[in-house]
């Protein structure tokens, strides 16, 4: 099946982009594997006009927004993000009225419709940097409460998080899990995602996005790393650092990320169906806060 996918991909002129949380078999056939920001940037650099995206809906839509002239297809239309779907345009409008001077900073894990109402988009890799650079001591931030709290800690700014309890179910680790792995692997370094709750972040050695997690073993010579994010990241790290050991903090699985399989990836290439289509107005409005993010990052 892998050979058939690679053959069809070449024949039809597709580039395959996969998120770090995809199953190992899909990471291995992808032309590029990365976090949402890395994938969006990669898509902008491509000369190819056809992209098969392996991730969840908001990520594929982000690629389409930044590459409106390219054909973007996905293997499973139902692969979505529960956290992104918790934030609605109505909630954003409500908080804009309450805090008219506060810029709206939306995490990339948000719907395209919500992005049209944002002042700037951020990722888990650059959220702190983006908020620091905004000329405001108060920001409205959504939809991840834990990332919002982390940004508040690091910037000293007032961060109003929306919706009330926005969070990623996959990253709800227990701080006790860190105590347990430290007993089992006393020399290990613990790296967790900023979407984790504060008690977990506070006990970790490092807090970082999946893109940042990849860079830590380049600087830290430790032999064992405990990883607090979705299980797919372990495969990416093991491939990049075969001489190190990577242990999951807990068996955290994103069922939506795992909806993509070799079977439906092959089917997507065969039929070229499930194309990502967005209204022109949404593309134009959502693109502005994304480009603002790139501007702020320099």
From Swiss-Prot:
Q: Which domain of life is it from?
A: Bacteria
Q: What is the effect of changing residue 219 to R?
A: No change in activity. Retains weak activity. Loss of activity
* Names of the cofactor(s): [4Fe-4S] cluster
Q: What detail does the entry give on cofactor binding?
A: Binds 1 [4Fe-4S] cluster per subunit.
Signal peptide feature range: none
Q: Which GO terms describe its biological process?
A: 'de novo' NAD biosynthetic process from L-aspartate
| GO CC entries | cytosol
Query: What keywords is this UniProt entry annotated with?
Result: 4Fe-4S, Cytoplasm, Iron, Iron-sulfur, Metal-binding, Pyridine nucleotide biosynthesis, Transferase
Residues that coordinate or bind iminosuccinate: 19, 36, 107-109, 124, 193-195, 210
> Which SUPFAM superfamilies does the record match to this protein?
NadA-like (SSF142754)
> Gene3D superfamilies under this entry?
NadA-like
Task: Report activity regulation.
Answer: Inhibited by 4,5 dithiohydroxyphthalic acid (DTHPA) analogs, which bind to the catalytic iron site of the [4Fe-4S] cluster.
Family, per the entry?
Answer: Belongs to the quinolinate synthase family. Type 2 subfamily.
Q: What does this protein do?
A: Catalyzes the condensation of iminoaspartate with dihydroxyacetone phosphate to form quinolinate.
User: What is the name of this protein?
Assistant: Quinolinate synthase
Protein source organism: Thermotoga maritima (strain ATCC 43589 / DSM 3109 / JCM 10099 / NBRC 100826 / MSB8)
